[in-house]
Amino acid sequence: MSGLLLRLAGPLQSWGERSAFTPVRETAPFPTRSALIGMFAAAQGIARGDTAGLKKYEQVRLTVRVDRPGTLLEDYHTVGGGFPKERTAATSGGSNKDAAVITRRQYLADAVFVVAVTAPDDLTAQLAAALRRPYWAPYLGRRSCAPDEPFLLRRHVEDPEEQLLTGVPLTSPELRDVAGETIAVQFLRERPLFEGGPGAAADAIEVNDMPISFHPHARAHAGRRLYRTVEPVSRALAGPQKTLLTRLIDYAHAEEHA
C-alpha cells in the first residue's frame, strides 16, 4: 500500500450528501467519499453508468485533514422565471413548470482540505497518472467549483497519512500566542486510531456517502462510519501565510527532485 496527497482549496466547494433534488441543496462540512471517488472515476474516464468500474475503489482509504473549515454560504437560485411555460424548466412527466423553480444551494467559502489517498501501489499509480492528465477535469463537488493549484501535492508516498501530520504545509495563520511544538487540527478518518495514541479519542459519525452507483437514473449510496479526531500536527507546518504558496509548491516539487 502507498498513496498520494490532494489539496482541495478554492473560492467555493460543495459536497452534497443527498442525490435527490430538494429545495435546499446542502453541503457536507467536508469532502465526501462519494465526491472523491466520483472525481477519481471521472479522471480515469469511467462513465457514470459503469457501476462495475467503481469496484476497484473499494480498496481506497481516505483521510481528510481540515486545514480551514470555511464559511457556509447559501446561494438563492432560480431556473426558468420570466419565460413562457414551454421555455420553463422541464418536469419528469414531460411537461414544463408553471413558474420559476426556486432552490437554495449551499457552499463552503474559502475552505481548505488535504486528503491522503491510500491504495494498492498499482491503483495509486493509475490515480496519480489520471489526476495529472484527467479525462474529465476534477472539481470540488460541483462543476463550477474549480480547485486551486497546487492540487496534486504528491503522486506517490509510502505513508500519506503520516505526511498529513509531519510534512504537508498547513493552511493556518501563525499562532504566536500558542505555546508548544504542535497545533491541534481536525481529521476525518475511515478507521479508528490505536487506543491511547494521539487523537485516539474520536467522535464516530454516520454518513451516507459510500457510492454504489453513479448512474444518472439510479444513483445509490450506502451508509458508513467516519471518525472525527483532533490530532497534534507539527507547528513547523504552519509558517507565515505570505510564504504558503511557495512552501506548497516546494513541497510538491520536492518529489520530482528526490
What are these regions (language model features)?
Residues 1, 61, 110-114:
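Short, surface-exposed beta-edge/turn micro-motifs
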Residues 2, 17-87:
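Glycine/small-residue-rich interface belts in oligomeric ring/scaffold proteins
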Residues 1-2, 214:
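Peripheral peptide segments
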Residues 66-258:
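Internal, well-folded beta-alpha domain core
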